[in-house]
């Protein structure tokens, strides 16, 4: 919105704060809130001012209505995003010279510019504030970390034989969705057990449509093979219905039905069928055994409990849907130690539900700031009433206490890990004679098979362990690299990584000490390369070409004799290669870093290879979408058979016109035509 000013004195109102001019709406006189300043409107009388004086200059023009404000430093970085019932009253508090915490005082001192937007209601301001904090990540706000979307289980509803899949993201496909689950691992375990219990297919639609005989899953009793009609449509529909009932919380009824069928089969001396029902019951019991506590009186709720100690806050979340426990997850939001736990939890909740569906009940371990306002905002956003409660007795109180115990345990583990990580980083700095303890270490590795589907992986570690949100993969694109040339691949990875970093961040200032509120650095202090002298030469050449050889310390880790762990040789600038004692904690630390880079690179390579393996030549043809692709594969069986078909044969397929048939034919015969 830079450079945009309201026309005719109008206010720029932007409910989502985007930078596109088309998204700016000029509010009419009838809709207009109290006069205020748009995000980008400048204030001439504030020129040259900073801190409390600048804030005071803005206060004079602020309205008493609700809105959102942003504080920025001289570089234009957003320091803080806040909302207010009255912008004038809230912002004027910052202009007071006394009564501020050290955190607020530092923030005020750094403020060189402010931006504001008015909203129609305080609820609207709260929702906008949460959205902006998640996107802009101001360093003085409470920040939700590891905000990955939750996985669901979906039973599809748009095919003859519904399938069972893990799903993330928008619910664009027709079907029944169950969740959220706390982790992908929990979904995987549940689907594995549901396969044994209900024998539903998990294959892709294209595989399902083209199977001519049952796959291995049918042989090991994990699927009923509807693809080849090994099960009737009616029987498969019954299995699907039972699976939906189980996932909807009707587990006892489903188990009773299967137990009755098992008893009937046994009475009829059909012991093979009875054994099948027995195995299905065991699979369902296995699912429930992993769910832990399953409350009878809580149908749909999220349970939050927080524990704050040692400058670290832990928020434990349990997910209950359809009366079942779908798991729990611990979060460690980034927050200044001076912020009260109730304020941390309140800010966390607003950001947590910014892009996630909210249950009808949210149970908390303690009251939070503006609890009623938050409930109203979540209700308005969800389209149904959301209650935020602090239970005092009964089953719900027990759930909160259980979550609080888990929060304390997770917090204790985190404190121990952080302390251990700090000691290891200090030992790492001493071992490699670094001038300071590294705050960001990047570890690189390549993965490929004979040069095919080559991928470079970068993992990141810091004072709090691995920072998975910073991981990056690099699909090797150079065509002039000899297949299997690890040095060439590493050169490409280094060039792409640091060229972009230079463009986005500029050279790091190593002479300045990081500030007390400095976030996680963008530039690495150290890069670890999985390789020996050859890899190090390639890396140093690139760093020198980019002019950053003095900005980053590069260290090579060569595998030991016979590739034995514990016998690694290290290569660092300005000293001979060396090894570390087998029991040195720093050696174990480096091995853990290298193994994580190896795992990530191999996983990225396998994902790319799998994608290439299932890639269909029909996907490359313009005008061939999923429907026509399915029709062609159903008619001809394989893509190779499609490539051999003539135009008349192609036209015989339902939905393929002469024009489309010619496009398909010419795609596969363009070389012959030349």
Swiss-Prot record:
Domain UVR as annotated: residue spans: 252-287
InterPro entries cross-referenced by the UniProt entry: GIY-YIG_endonuc, GIY-YIG_endonuc_sf, GIY-YIG_UvrC_Cho, RuvA_2-like, UVR_dom, UVR_dom_sf, UvrABC_protein_C, UvrC
PROSITE patterns attached to this UniProt entry: GIY_YIG, UVR, UVRC
UniProtKB keywords: Cytoplasm, DNA damage, DNA excision, DNA repair, Excision nuclease, SOS response
Gene Ontology CC: one annotated term: cytoplasm
Compartments in which it is found: Cytoplasm
Major subcellular location class: cytoplasm
All residue ranges annotated as the GIY-YIG domain in the record: 64-142
Keyword DNA damage included in the entry's annotation: yes
Quaternary data: Interacts with UvrB in an incision complex.
NCBIfam families: PRK00558.1-5 (NF001824), uvrC (TIGR00194)
PANTHER family: UVRABC SYSTEM PROTEIN C (PTHR30562:SF1), UVRC/OXIDOREDUCTASE (PTHR30562)
Similarity annotation: Belongs to the UvrC family.
Function according to Swiss-Prot or TrEMBL: The UvrABC repair system catalyzes the recognition and processing of DNA lesions. UvrC both incises the 5' and 3' sides of the lesion. The N-terminal half is responsible for the 3' incision and the C-terminal half is responsible for the 5' incision.
Name of the protein in question: UvrABC system protein C
Organism: Rhizobium meliloti (strain 1021)
């Amino acid at each position: 919105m830079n450079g945009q000013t309201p026309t005719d004195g109008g206010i720029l109102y932007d409910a989502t704060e985007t930078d596109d001019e088309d998204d700016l709406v000029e509010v009419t006189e009838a809709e207009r809130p109290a006069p205020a300043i748009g995000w980008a409107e400048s204030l001439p009388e504030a020129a040259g001012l900073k801190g409390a004086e600048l804030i005071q200059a803005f206060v004079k023009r602020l309205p008493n209505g609700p809105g959102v404000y942003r504080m920025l430093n001289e570089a234009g970085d957003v320091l803080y995003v806040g909302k207010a019932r009255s912008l004038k009253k809230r912002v004027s508090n910052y202009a007071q010279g006394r009564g501020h915490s050290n955190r607020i005082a530092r923030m005020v001192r750094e403020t060189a510019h402010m931006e504001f937007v008015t909203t129609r209601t305080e609820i609207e301001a709260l929702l906008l504030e949460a959205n902006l904090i998640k996107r802009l990540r101001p360093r003085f706000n409470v920040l939700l970390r590891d905000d990955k979307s939750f996985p669901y289980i979906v039973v599809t509803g748009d095919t003859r034989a519904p399938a069972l899949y893990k799903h993330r993201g928008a619910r664009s496909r027709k079907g029944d969705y169950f969740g959220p689950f706390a982790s992908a691992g929990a979904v995987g375990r549940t689907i594995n057990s549901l396969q044994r219990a209900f024998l539903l297919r998990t294959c892709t639609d294209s595989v399902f449509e083209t199977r001519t005989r049952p796959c291995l899953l049918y042989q090991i009793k994990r699927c009923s093979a509807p693809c080849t009609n090994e099960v009737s449509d009616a029987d498969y529909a019954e299995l699907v219905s039972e699976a939906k009932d189980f996932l909807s919380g009707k587990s006892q009824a489903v188990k009773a039905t299967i137990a009755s069928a098992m008893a009937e089969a046994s009475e009829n001396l059909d012991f093979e069928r009875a054994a099948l029902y027995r195995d299905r019951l065991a699979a369902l019991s296995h699912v429930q055994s992993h769910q832990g506590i399953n409350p009878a009186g809580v149908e749909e709720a999220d349970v939050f409990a927080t524990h704050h100690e040692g400058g670290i806050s832990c928020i434990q979340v349990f997910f209950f849907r359809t009366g079942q426990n779908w798991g729990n997850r611990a979060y460690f939001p980034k927050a200044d130690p001076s912020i009260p736990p109730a304020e941390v939890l309140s800010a966390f909740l607003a950001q947590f539900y910014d892009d996630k569906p909210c249950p009808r009940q949210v149970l908390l371990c303690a009251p939070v700031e503006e609890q009623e306002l938050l409930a109203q905002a979540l209700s308005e956003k969800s389209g149904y009433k959301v209650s935020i409660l602090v239970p005092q007795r009964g089953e719900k109180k027990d759930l909160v206490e259980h979550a609080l115990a888990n929060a304390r345990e997770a917090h204790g583990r985190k404190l121990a890990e952080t302390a251990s990580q700090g000691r290891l980083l200090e030992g790492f700095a001493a071992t490699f004679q670094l001038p300071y303890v590294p705050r960001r270490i990047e570890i690189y590795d390549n993965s490929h098979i004979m040069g095919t589907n080559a991928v470079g992986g970068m993992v990141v570690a810091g004072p709090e362990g691995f920072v998975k949100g910073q991981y990056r993969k690099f699909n090797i694109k150079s065509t002039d690299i000899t297949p299997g040339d690890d040095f060439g691949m590493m050169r490409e990875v280094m060039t792409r990584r640091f060229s972009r970093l230079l463009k986005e961040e500029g050279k790091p200032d190593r002479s300045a000490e990081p500030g007390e509120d400095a976030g996680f650095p963008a530039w690495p202090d150290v890069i670890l390369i999985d390789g020996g002298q050859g890899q190090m030469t390639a890396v140093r050449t690139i760093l020198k070409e980019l002019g950053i050889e003095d900005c980053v310390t590069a260290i090579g880790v060569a595998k030991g004799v016979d590739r034995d762990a514990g016998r690694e040789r290290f290569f660092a600038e300005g000293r001979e290669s060396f090894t570390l004692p087998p029991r040195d904690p720093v050696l174990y630390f480096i091995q853990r870093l290298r193994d994580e880079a190896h795992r990530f690179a191999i996983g990225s390579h396998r994902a790319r290879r799998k994608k290439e393996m299932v890639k269909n030549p029909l996907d490359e043809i313009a005008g061939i979408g999923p429907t026509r692709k399915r029709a062609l594969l159903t008619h001809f069986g394989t893509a190779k058979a499609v490539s051999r078909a003539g135009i008349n044969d192609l036209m015989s397929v339902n939905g393929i016109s002469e024009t489309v048939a010619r496009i398909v034919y010419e795609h596969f015969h363009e070389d012959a035509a030349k």
